[in-house]
């Protein structure tokens, strides 16, 4: 079995890391370069940066952040938020990102997934899906969780894989920022149907929550933010817990 990955997520707004609940009520969580270096030292397997301001001006700031981080941190960096074109992807990959994450742009232009995979390799293309439970299923939302896309999340994940996505970053809007656990029904429903890795996101409050997403939710990796940003747990503590529960994890850089 491949090692399960623990991935801190850094939402960046105006060059600062922030965290909210269900995508709103943002509060400051620190300097992105300092936090990234700390997580690298603690044993993070990867880092995800999401530019939640995503204006043209801020994208330049994001590229600068990625460039600084890539000099300090020697694990894969995935960067997303407002990427709309091959040129946007190229800017961040040249700045030092290893992967790019696309969300709203992939929904409005699914062929962007294929074009990105063809140009950079599918291992570079992460399709982020923000899903909200509706009835007996889950609907895809875009524009930072504000706009219903009229797509079933499971069907969209299957299509994204077929188009060339190398990974799915799956966020439960219902669970995001609440620290009460991931939506493992959603995680399992999508993980069980795909041949590419699924990163579970939204809801981590304890090491047990991460374990459940990897075990019950069948995710390949877990994304977490506030439990690390505010010092509730270190990455090393979480990974030791996962190892104690029998999951394969990498324990040192």
Curated annotation (Swiss-Prot):
Cross-referenced InterPro entries: Aldolase_TIM, His_biosynth, HisF, IGPS_HisA/HisF, RibuloseP-bd_barrel
Catalytic activity: 5-[(5-phospho-1-deoxy-D-ribulos-1-ylimino)methylamino]-1-(5-phospho-beta-D-ribosyl)imidazole-4-carboxamide + L-glutamine = D-erythro-1-(imidazol-4-yl)glycerol 3-phosphate + 5-amino-1-(5-phospho-beta-D-ribosyl)imidazole-4-carboxamide + L-glutamate + H(+)
Domain of life per record: Bacteria
Matching Pfam families: His_biosynth
The UniProt record lists the keyword Lyase: yes
Annotated metabolic or biological route of this protein: Amino-acid biosynthesis; L-histidine biosynthesis; L-histidine from 5-phospho-alpha-D-ribose 1-diphosphate: step 5/9
Gene Ontology cellular-component terms listed: cytoplasm
UniProt-annotated catalytic positions: 11, 130
The protein's assembly and partners: Heterodimer of HisH and HisF.
Record-given protein name: Imidazole glycerol phosphate synthase subunit HisF
Gene name, Swiss-Prot/TrEMBL: hisF
């Amino acid at each position: 079995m491949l090692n399960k990955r623990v991935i801190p997520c850094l939402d960046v707004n105006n060059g600062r890391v922030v965290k909210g609940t269900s995508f709103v009520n943002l509060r400051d969580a620190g300097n992105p370069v300092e936090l990234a270096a700390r997580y690298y030292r603690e044993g993070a397997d990867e880092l995800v940066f999401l530019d939640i301001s995503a204006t043209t001006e801020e994208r330049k700031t994001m590229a600068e952040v990625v460039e600084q981080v890539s000099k300090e941190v020697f694990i894969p960096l995935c960067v997303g938020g407002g990427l709309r074109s091959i040129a946007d992807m190229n800017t961040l990959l040249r700045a030092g990102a290893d992967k790019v994450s696309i969300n709203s742009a992939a929904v409005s232009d699914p062929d962007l997934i294929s074009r990105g995979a063809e140009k950079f390799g599918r291992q570079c293309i992460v399709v982020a899906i923000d899903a909200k439970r509706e009835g007996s299923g889950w609907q895809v939302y875009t524009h930072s969780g504000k706009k219903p896309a009229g797509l079933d999340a499971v069907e969209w994940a299957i299509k994204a894989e077929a188009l060339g996505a190398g990974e799915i970053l799956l966020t439960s809007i219902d669970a995001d920022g609440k620290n009460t656990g991931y939506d493992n029904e959603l995680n399992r429903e999508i993980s069980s149907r795909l041949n590419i890795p699924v990163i579970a996101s939204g809801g981590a409050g304890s090491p047990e929550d991460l374990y459940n997403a990897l075990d019950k939710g069948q995710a390949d990796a877990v994304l977490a933010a506030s439990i690390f940003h505010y010092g509730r747990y270190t990455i090393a503590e979480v990974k030791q817990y996962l190892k104690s529960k029998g999951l394969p994890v990498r324990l040192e850089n």
